Design a protein with these regions (language model features):
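N-terminal secretory signal peptides that target proteins for export/translocation
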Residues: 1-2
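Bacterial N-terminal signal peptides
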Residues: 5-15
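Contiguous, well-ordered beta-strand patches that form the walls/edges
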Residues: 35-51, 59-126
Length: 145
């Protein structure tokens, strides 16, 4: 139960990608439907059964993450001008309502990588999840139509 809740929170954090807009081929544009290809929380692999039922949708400055039938919605704010690129995710509806998570992201074609700090205390500085932290590292693949 605790693992499922952490998974929901984690996925809904990553759903936190900000206003992308613009050229869909730009590495700064993260609009689309994204499915987690792999993920780890606190340095440990994320449960496969949860990964398979998770979906992140980003549309402009809005996100929606669904884990099974548990939706989480909110807004994202991107800062692509810094390295690594930054993402602020704020929940507006669901289990993360009124919570803000700081993250970093990078996109390469149809692959999006996001590292979230689920403690909500600081922004990750690298794409790494280590034991004893609440860092959630997810590699997403864009869902094809």
């Amino acid at each position: 139960m605790v693992l499922r809740l952490l998974a929901i929170v984690a996925l809904q954090m990553f759903a936190l990608t900000a206003s992308s807009g613009g050229d869909p081929k730009s590495a700064d544009n993260i609009d689309g439907t994204w499915l987690p290809a792999k993920a780890e929380l606190a340095g440990k692999p994320w449960p496969e059964e949860i990964r398979k039922i998770t979906r992140l949708v980003i549309d402009g400055d809005k996100y929606s993450v669904t884990v099974g039938d548990a939706p989480d919605k909110g807004t994202i704010k991107l800062n692509p001008a810094v390295k690594p690129k930054q993402l602020d995710i704020t929940g507006t509806d669901g289990p993360n309502k009124d919570k803000t998570y700081l993250a970093i992201y990078e996109r390469d074609g149809d692959t999006l990588r996001i590292c979230y700090d689920l403690s909500g205390k600081s922004r990750p500085t690298e794409f790494k999840s280590t034991e004893g932290t609440k860092l959630f590292l997810v590699t997403y693949e864009r869902q094809k139509p």
